[in-house]
Amino acid sequence: MNWRKLSGVLCDKKISVKKKGRLYKTVVRPALMYSAETWPITKAEERKMEVTEMRMLRWMSGVTRMDRIRNEYIRGSVKVGPIGKKIQESRMRWFGHLERRDEDYIGKQIEKLEIRGRRKRGRPKKRWKDKVNEDLREKGWRRGEALDRGLWRRRIKDGNADPI
C-alpha cells in the first residue's frame, strides 16, 4: 500500500492511462528489472514479479480485482507486456553480447566455469546457463545465431514483449 501513497503521478486520476504507461515503462519497470539479464529466475519468482507488476498496473488504471477486468485488457490499455517476457528479452540480449565477446573476457570465462567437487544434496539450483538454454529451446533459436549481431537484434525485436 505504501507504493500507492508514494506514487502520486502514477495513481493520479487526471493523467491519462497512456501517459502513465509510458512513465511506468521508463521509470518503474527498469527499477524492478535492474540487472535482470543475469538472474537465473525460477517460475515462482517470475510469477511473483508478474503479480507485483499487475498490482501496480491495476492501481495506475484505477481498477480493483472486484471490477473483474482481465489482466490482458489492463495490459492492452496501458500498452505494457508481461514482465517475464521483458526479463527473457534482456537475458537473450545479454547472452548475445556475451557470445560475441572474446574468449579471454572475464564474463565469458565465468559463464563456462565448471566447479569441481560435490554439490549439496537435493535438486541442483537453477543456473543462468540452464535458463538461457531453456529460453533458446523455447524460441527455437541456436547459440551460433548470436554471433550475427544484426540477426540476433532482429530476433529479439521480433519477439518484443511490449505491444505498440
Specify the residue positions occupied by each region the protein language model found.
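Short linear motifs embedded in intrinsically disordered, charge-biased segments
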Residues: 1-164
